[in-house]
């Protein structure tokens, strides 16, 4: 008798995705982050659902409803901090997942890569709107500053901003719609992740060498299920340690002050995972230029496959490209640091240099270096 998991209409989808999936035998722990992102999404949806049961999206009561969750709801503080710090873990996994894709040439799977870029945008939008919901000082002013950037769009800018606000400033209408979008987007992200997996399973996984691995495949279960479980346990260990020992480590103290439109905080800055993009935005003195640079800092990922000039897919055997990759990582860490600093000397010039280097590395230096490495192979 044929196994039920191979014949049942639903079970065979699960079987071909997570059990009998042929996987390369040499994929390293850098390939764990896909499953970790899935776990992060599940954690965020579950904790978010329980938070939504107690949260009110009204300017008069939003802040106090979050306080009520932390003080009066059973384990409300735990749910709230799991959700807030779960977002940080989500972004850590995202950045490592994207970095892995860049290093090992996974971007050569165009459909999978482009849906991944779309997913990154969707998660960033969700996180931004979620940050507005507690209605603290940084929530309000962050929303004001970021939505205001759209006014830089010629002709329709100011109308667009008022349309998004639902009035003439960030107010009740804005908060209500942000809550609605923040609730629906994770489900859209889950659907997109399904499509992301669908396209990945059309081609099969890449591997560290970047060479075809059809001749050497192993079943996903038990090898990679066990490996993924180890990753999940480490993720949960990191998240619970953060939540139980220093839940406010990555937050902003200003967000414990209720939103006040009449009092601007001295330093408006987003959560740590947006700081690199915020630094790029601030490094250009022109408003429209800054907005374009901000959008391009993420959109540039969609261009990466077309800038691949190397004869080899992975960077495993390309030491010069490896050096440039780690310079890019250091540059992004520098931008993250600059994004959290005040706009004054020497931070302004450091931010501008780091922003220029970011775009130069991806658009010019890395493709030229790849061509140089191709010529090295001839010698």
UniProtKB/Swiss-Prot annotation:
Quaternary structure (record): The cytochrome bc1 complex contains 11 subunits: 3 respiratory subunits (MT-CYB, CYC1 and UQCRFS1), 2 core proteins (UQCRC1 and UQCRC2) and 6 low-molecular weight proteins (UQCRH/QCR6, UQCRB/QCR7, UQCRQ/QCR8, UQCR10/QCR9, UQCR11/QCR10 and a cleavage product of UQCRFS1). This cytochrome bc1 complex then forms a dimer.
Keyword Transmembrane: yes
Subcellular location: Mitochondrion inner membrane
Coiled-coil annotated residue ranges, if any: none
Leader peptide range in chain numbering: none
GO annotations of cellular component type: mitochondrial inner membrane; respiratory chain complex III
Membrane topology field: Multi-pass membrane protein
Sequence positions that bind heme b b562: 83, 182
Family per similarity comment: Belongs to the cytochrome b family.
High-level lineage: Eukaryota, Metazoa, Chordata, Craniata, Vertebrata
MF terms in GO: metal ion binding; ubiquinol-cytochrome-c reductase activity
Note in the entry: Heme 1 (or BL or b562) is low-potential and absorbs at about 562 nm, and heme 2 (or BH or b566) is high-potential and absorbs at about 566 nm.
Binding sites annotated in the UniProt record for a ubiquinone: 201
Name of the molecule in the record: Cytochrome b
Transmembrane spans: 33-53, 77-98, 113-133, 178-198, 226-246, 288-308, 320-340, 347-367
Species per Swiss-Prot/TrEMBL record: Sorex raddei (Radde's shrew)
Keywords annotated in UniProt: Electron transport, Heme, Iron, Membrane, Metal-binding, Mitochondrion, Mitochondrion inner membrane, Respiratory chain, Transmembrane, Transmembrane helix, Transport, Ubiquinone
Family annotation (InterPro entries): Cyt_b/b6_C (IPR005798), Cyt_b/b6_C_sf (IPR036150), Cyt_b/b6_N (IPR005797), Cytb/b6-like_sf (IPR027387), Cytochrome_b (IPR030689), Cytochrome_b_C_euk/bac (IPR048260), Cytochrome_b_N_euk/bac (IPR048259), Di-haem_cyt_TM (IPR016174)
CC cofactor: heme b
Record note on cofactor: Binds 2 heme b groups non-covalently.
Function: Component of the ubiquinol-cytochrome c reductase complex (complex III or cytochrome b-c1 complex) that is part of the mitochondrial respiratory chain. The b-c1 complex mediates electron transfer from ubiquinol to cytochrome c. Contributes to the generation of a proton gradient across the mitochondrial membrane that is then used for ATP synthesis.
Main location group: mitochondrion
